[in-house]
């Protein structure tokens, strides 16, 4: 069964209503139409990917905030907003870009780093097109074909499932901090179902379970 990144990411973001789901999938389609360059069919896949990246930054240059949106629906709304709000954090920007890439016929992956820019865990897009492997740093306006992570010894490639797992992990942490332990646990467990080797989700789940025991 095909793993639909956009649908799964929206579900992980908290959308359950089919009408809402269709609405946001339609918004993704609108963004593709908005940012697809004229004559795109004549461009190489690499050029299409670059032009999409540049168009997103041109339209919303105030894109990145470390604690910004990570839910796909919120990132989409921020991208479409005329209020100049920040679009998202590294996870949100990467999911948005990868979803749009799929809609123009390009399969992007994600790259997970344990410590990027000296600030901790980080995700970005990685493209494998023809003989090229290109990092796309979604938090930087000049981030297409970014070279700064090439020598990182802890580069870990993520597929769509692992990327969606990070949404569940982020939601779990958000709910944990709000004291909604039961819902937090569900999200950590969903993260681990999609990415059983995700140590961060496993650790946070263990911390949560210990906390729940002490408060029984």
Task: Show the residue positions of the predicted features.
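Residue-level recognition of tetratricopeptide repeat
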Residues: 164, 197-198
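Secondary-structure boundary elements
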Residues: 3-7, 11-81
């Amino acid at each position: 069964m095909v793993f639909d990144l956009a649908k799964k990411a929206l579900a992980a973001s908290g959308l359950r209503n089919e009408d809402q789901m269709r609405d946001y999938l339609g918004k993704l389609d609108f963004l593709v139409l908005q940012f697809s360059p004229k004559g795109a069919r004549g461009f190489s896949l690499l050029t299409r990917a670059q032009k999409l990246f540049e168009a997103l930054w041109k339209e919303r240059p105030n894109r990145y905030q470390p604690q910004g949106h990570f839910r796909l629906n919120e990132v989409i709304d921020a991208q479409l907003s005329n209020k100049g709000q920040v679009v998202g954090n590294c996870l949100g920007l990467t999911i948005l870009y990868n979803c749009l890439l799929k809609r123009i016929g390009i399969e992007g992956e994600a790259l997970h780093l344990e410590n990027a820019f000296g600030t901790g865990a980080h995700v970005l897009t990685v493209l494998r097109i023809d003989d090229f492997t290109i990092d796309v740093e979604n938090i930087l306006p000049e981030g297409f074909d970014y070279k700064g992570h090439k020598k990182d010894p802890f580069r870990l490639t993520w597929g769509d499932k692992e990327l969606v797992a990070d949404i569940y992990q982020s939601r779990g942490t958000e709910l944990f901090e709000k004291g909604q332990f039961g819902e937090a646990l569900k999200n950590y467990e969903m993260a681990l179902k999609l990415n059983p080797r995700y140590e961060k989700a496993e650790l946070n789940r263990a911390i949560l379970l210990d906390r729940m025991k002490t408060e029984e």
